[in-house]
């Protein structure tokens, strides 16, 4: 556990360097320009500065908040791109499964279904379908041809529903028989799975909005109270004292970390559904 925490801390500092952050994001199939990186940092630091002044924090404490956020900023960015990557993978799987079923119902040939499905796909899954087609068209060995050809797609996405569909398509391809009703059942299952997942994501997005709204409202009320107290000379001295400064720094730090932590937690539940 301790070793895992050390690795997480080292990775956090590793990603502070833009080139390392960019390389990680590129691994998910996206680009993140240095201009966007600087703009995001600037807006974040501006928000921290305004919040600090709003709560009458002294400059050293505001700088401390900025440095703390800088450490977490790359991880927040990476998690956002990772979520986009996982979301795209989910859409790829759903589109692939539905189109394979529709195509195979019209003509029960795997190679034909792959060719038709390919027309509606793009990105990584398109390349994998090409690989599967080539493996079927130019077999090295005839034994278990279709299972071997489709395995490259299964290994990439590791989806139980995909493997179940492939197993059934291979069975029909090799043995024939009635297949329409079973494919209809599989298709209904895929649609229900898709609807459940999208509904879950919608609920999580709503929860994320409520978290942001609650944080903003709490900070606004607390900040307004501080502004009112600052007009009193005696209370103004309290606001400049070390007890208030340290306590406010700690609370703002918690608020600052609460959003990315809750965001990451919700996203992890969405993609893991």
Model-inferred region functions:
Residues 1-6, 136-170, 174, 181, ...:
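Membrane-anchoring/interfacial helices and their immediately flanking loops
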Residues 2-20, 100-117, 160-200:
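Hydrophobic alpha-helical segments characteristic of transmembrane helices
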Residues 10-47, 86, 180-217, 231-239:
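Membrane-interface, cytosolic juxtamembrane amphipathic helix immediately N-terminal to a transmembrane helix
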Residues 56-67, 238-250:
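Hydrophobic alpha-helical transmembrane segments
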Residues 60-148, 273:
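Juxtamembrane/interface alpha-helical elements of multi-pass membrane proteins
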Residues 147, 154, 226-245:
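Membrane-interfacial helix-loop-helix connectors in multipass membrane proteins
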Residues 217, 243-263:
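Alpha-helical transmembrane segments of multi-pass membrane transporters/translocases
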Residues 265-273:
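Single conserved hydrophobic/aromatic residue that forms the stacking wall/gate
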């Amino acid at each position: 556990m301790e070793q895992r925490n050390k690795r997480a801390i080292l990775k956090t500092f590793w990603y502070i360097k833009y080139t390392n952050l960019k390389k990680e994001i590129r691994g998910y199939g996206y680009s993140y320009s240095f201009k966007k990186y600087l703009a995001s940092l600037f807006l974040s630091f501006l928000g921290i500065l305004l919040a600090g002044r709003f709560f009458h924090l002294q400059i050293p404490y505001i700088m401390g908040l900025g440095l703390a956020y800088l450490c977490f900023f790359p991880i927040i960015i990476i998690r956002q791109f990772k979520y986009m990557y996982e979301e795209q993978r989910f859409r790829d799987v759903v589109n692939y499964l539905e189109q394979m079923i529709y195509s195979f119902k019209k003509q029960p040939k795997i190679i034909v279904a792959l060719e038709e499905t390919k027309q509606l796909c793009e990105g990584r899954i398109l390349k994998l379908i090409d690989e599967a087609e080539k493996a079927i068209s130019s077999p090295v060995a005839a034994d278990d041809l279709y299972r071997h050809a489709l395995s490259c797609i299964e290994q990439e996405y590791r989806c139980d529903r995909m493997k179940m569909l492939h197993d059934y398509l291979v069975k029909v391809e090799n043995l024939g028989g009635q297949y329409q009703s079973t494919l209809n059942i599989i298709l209904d299952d895929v649609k229900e799975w898709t609807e459940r997942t999208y509904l879950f994501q919608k609920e999580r997005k709503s929860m994320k909005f409520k978290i942001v709204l609650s944080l903003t409202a709490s900070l606004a009320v607390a900040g307004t109270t501080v502004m009112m107290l600052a007009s009193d000379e005696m209370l103004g001295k309290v606001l400049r004292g070390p007890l208030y400064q340290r306590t406010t720094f700690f609370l703002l730090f918690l608020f600052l970390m609460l959003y990315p932590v809750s965001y990451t937690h919700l996203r992890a539940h969405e993609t893991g559904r």
